[in-house]
């Protein structure tokens, strides 16, 4: 079985998408066409047009390949990554392999949108971004709390599709096969503490508005965003093939699950065992729990795939700092290298950073903010630190006035303090 794949987009070799081999690298037809457009521009393309790219994804990565892509950037969350990979695979298989179904077969495969439940900074947004990049499809990310019903100050729900259209560079067909990630969906529940007493600006009314686009319909979208008005131009977007992913922390959900199961909060404390038990409880979430939380049944009925993410542990935090392809430590080391300096962290310093992120309850998302705080003065002086190795110690994390170790690199490669 031929397992060669394009070194640029990872598409496997097929009859319709052959590969050109180089020195241990391969490039597919679609990447050659893309490179031609970049190098020679629109004028050359019009004078000597190339064959149009085939619509859609020529090769749909398998669930294992999708999970492998997630593994490169998302630490832990094994069950969530597996569920997510299968759901994304089935979604795009449903779109691009319709021709494999018998014409007489009237079975219609419904769209499976996804709900990700997990603490802040557990990787919900990162998972969506990673697979969108891997599949080369546009993605729009929005915060549900910024959405309001038509007629109130805030964003119309249709503006989500405007963002997707802009991410697709105005290509409607490409946008119609993209991904929309709606974060903090739990904050627009009917039981939200932020809900107005006199009117429902960003609660059930927004859920009803979201329902229309999530379930699949043709929506008039203002290409430049903003509020709709009669004299405005609109673009029609069919949302039936757009994958909608909703995410939220759903604080207090565990108590609802305990109540449904006839239990109580006794025995659950802030220790490690208690945290793991609470994560296990969250995995037992059911649609009825979401209704009790304040999401309308119609919306839950359109989110067929529900999975949960665990709270990030200290061990996972340490891996997040150093292991992924775009690990934060690697990013900051690259910034230092650009100024001909070197950056390293003592193991104790990384542990202190992880512990501080856990203390702040910001998850993996808070790691960058902590490193920014620790390296601020160094970044300010970085142009003067050429040919130095900078070592961040535990003291630098715990005490902002502490100075890092500076080691001068000699020309022969040796270092001196």
Curated annotation (Swiss-Prot):
ATP-dependent specificity component of the Clp protease. It directs the protease to specific substrates. Can perform chaperone functions in the absence of ClpP. Belongs to the ClpX chaperone family. InterPro entries: AAA+_ATPase (IPR003593), ATP-dep_Clp_protease_ClpX (IPR050052), ATPase_AAA_core (IPR003959), Clp_ATPase_C (IPR019489), Clp_protease_ATP-bd_su_ClpX (IPR004487), ClpX_bact (IPR046425), P-loop_NTPase (IPR027417), Znf_CppX_C4 (IPR010603). It holds the Pfam family zf-C4_ClpX. GO terms for biological process: cell division; proteolysis involved in protein catabolic process. The keyword RNA-binding does not apply. GO terms for molecular function: ATP binding; ATP hydrolysis activity; ATP-dependent protein folding chaperone; protein dimerization activity; unfolded protein binding; zinc ion binding. Signal peptide: none annotated. This is ATP-dependent Clp protease ATP-binding subunit ClpX 1. The lineage of its organism: Bacteria, Pseudomonadati, Campylobacterota, Epsilonproteobacteria, Campylobacterales. ATP binds at residues 119-126. Residues 1-47 form the ClpX-type ZB domain. Zn(2+) binds at residues 6, 9, 28, 31. It comes from the Bacteria. Component of the ClpX-ClpP complex. Forms a hexameric ring that, in the presence of ATP, binds to fourteen ClpP subunits assembled into a disk-like structure with a central cavity, resembling the structure of eukaryotic proteasomes. GO terms for cellular component: HslUV protease complex. Keywords: ATP-binding, Chaperone, Metal-binding, Nucleotide-binding, Zinc. It comes from Wolinella succinogenes (strain ATCC 29543 / DSM 1740 / CCUG 13145 / JCM 31913 / LMG 7466 / NCTC 11488 / FDC 602W).
């Amino acid at each position: 079985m031929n397992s060669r794949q394009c070194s640029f987009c990872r598409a496997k070799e097929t009859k319709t998408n052959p590969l050109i081999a180089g020195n241990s690298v391969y490039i597919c037809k679609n990447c050659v066409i893309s490179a031609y457009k970049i190098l020679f521009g629109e004028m050359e393309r019009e004078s000597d047009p190339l064959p149009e790219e085939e619509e859609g994804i020529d090769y749909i990565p398998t669930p294992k390949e999708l999970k492998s892509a997630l593994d490169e950037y998302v630490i832990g969350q094994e069950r969530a990554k597996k569920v997510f990979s299968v759901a994304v695979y089935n979604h795009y298989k449903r779109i691009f392999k319709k021709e494999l179904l018998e014409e007489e077969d009237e079975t219609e495969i419904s769209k499976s949108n996804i709900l990700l439940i997990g603490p802040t900074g557990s990787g919900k947004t990162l998972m969506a971004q990673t697979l969108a990049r891997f599949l080369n499809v546009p993605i729009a990310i929005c915060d549900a709390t910024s959405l309001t019903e038509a007629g109130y100050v805030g964003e119309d729900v249709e503006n989500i599709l405007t963002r997707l259209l802009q991410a697709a560079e105005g290509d409607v067909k490409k946008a119609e096969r993209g991904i929309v990630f709606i974060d903090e969906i739990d904050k627009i529940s009917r039981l939200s503490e932020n809900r107005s007493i006199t009117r429902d600006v960003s609660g059930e009314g927004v859920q009803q508005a979201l329902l229309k686009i999530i379930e699949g319909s043709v929506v008039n979208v203002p290409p430049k965003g903003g509020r709709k008005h009669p004299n405005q131009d609109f673009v029609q977007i069919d949302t039936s093939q757009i994958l909608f992913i909703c995410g939220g922390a759903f604080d207090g959900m565990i108590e609802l699950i305990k109540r449904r199961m006839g239990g109580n909060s006794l025995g659950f404390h802030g220790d490690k065992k208690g945290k793991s038990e609470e994560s296990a409880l969250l995995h037992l979430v059911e649609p009825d729990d979401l209704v009790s939380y304040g999401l309308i049944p119609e919306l839950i009925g359109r989110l067929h795939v529900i999975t949960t993410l665990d709270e990030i542990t200290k061990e996972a935090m340490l891996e997040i700092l150093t292991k992924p392809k775009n690990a934060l430590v690697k990013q900051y080391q690259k910034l230092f290298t650009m100024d001909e300096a070197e950056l390293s962290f003592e193991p104790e310093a990384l542990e202190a950073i992880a512990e501080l992120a856990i203390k702040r309850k910001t998850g993996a998302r808070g790691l960058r903010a902590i490193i920014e705080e620790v390296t601020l003065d160094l970044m300010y002086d970085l142009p003067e630190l050429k040919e130095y190795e900078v070592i961040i110690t535990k003291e630098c994390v715990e005490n902002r006035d502490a100075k890092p170790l500076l080691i001068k690199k000699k020309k022969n490669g040796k270092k001196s303090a």
